[in-house]
Amino acid sequence: MNYYTQKNNAGSLNISENVFVQIANDSLSELMKEELKNIVFLKNVNKQAKTHCEIDKKNHIKVDVEVYLSADCEAGKISTKIQKEIYDDIYDATEISAVKVNVIILGFISKK
């Protein structure tokens, strides 16, 4: 497990990768309840989508969010919306701006 570390005179702040995953998952859940309901999915018949976070030794944070999308949606527009919401929520919670959020589309789901 890696941590984002920020040192100051009083000590250090260490934020676990799990915190960034939790924020991303919470953001995605909210979007799926409201704006992106029936457009974004976290599972298909065979696979569950996951969220990953990596923090390297230089304190660079990368959050990868896997999703399935409805086949009839605008994938670029939807993935940009997801990316922006997650980035904004991470910034609001941590005040860290050096975060990359990657949306990985695992597939498309046809509505029946």
Located regions from the model:
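Short, highly charged C-terminal tails/helix-capping segments
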Residues: S97-K112
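N-proximal, solvent-exposed amphipathic alpha-helical segments enriched in charged/polar residues
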Residues: T5-H52
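Short, non-transmembrane amphipathic alpha-helical segments
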Residues: E74-T94
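Short small-residue beta-strand/loop micro-motif enriched in glycine and branched aliphatics
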Residues: V63-D64, C73-A75
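Conserved NTP-handling cores and scaffolds of large molecular machines
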Residues: L31-E35, T94, K112
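Protein-protein interaction and targeting regions used for scaffolding, dimerization, and localization
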Residues: L13, V67-Y68, G76
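Short edge beta-strands and adjacent turn/loop segments
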Residues: L36-Y68, V103-G107
